[in-house]
Amino acid sequence: MGKALIVYAGRSGETKRIADLIAEGIRIQGSEASVVNITKVKKVEDLEGFDAYVFGSATYHGEMMQGMKTMLFLAEKTGLEGKVGGSFGAFGWSGEAPGRIFDTMQNIFKMDMVNGPLMLKSALLGGGVEMAQGYGKDIAKKF
């Protein structure tokens, strides 16, 4: 049984809701998942010891949240090459953050990424619950 770390950055609670649903999908597949607010990640050691990493941020003014940018610099020092990865985010008008996180994880960290980033306006709209849980299941199938 593998372990996944899901780190999220958001203000309204929507990004956390998506993170929790992704974790449910991972657990349905029989793996462990820890959901952590970005404010709890302060050092490289906070990111070590997992088989999969899923990073998510809300998009504000076309950008990921500053806490996620800072955490990605820490993650770069963690040695994530070859680890399973995914990205997600909630947005109101535009959804650039999940794609930028995904590109960083794939091209800089050289991670084994799942299909693509998960971008939802809300976990509760348009099948969002199923999409987020399905994303978690897809991640769990890779490790």
Where do the PLM segments sit?
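FMN-binding flavodoxin-like domain, especially the glycine-rich phosphate-binding loop
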Residues: 2-4, 14-17, 21-35, 48-143
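Cofactor-binding loop segments of dinucleotide-utilizing enzymes, especially the Rossmann-like FAD-
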Residues: 9, 38, 90
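Short acidic active-site motifs
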Residues: 41-46
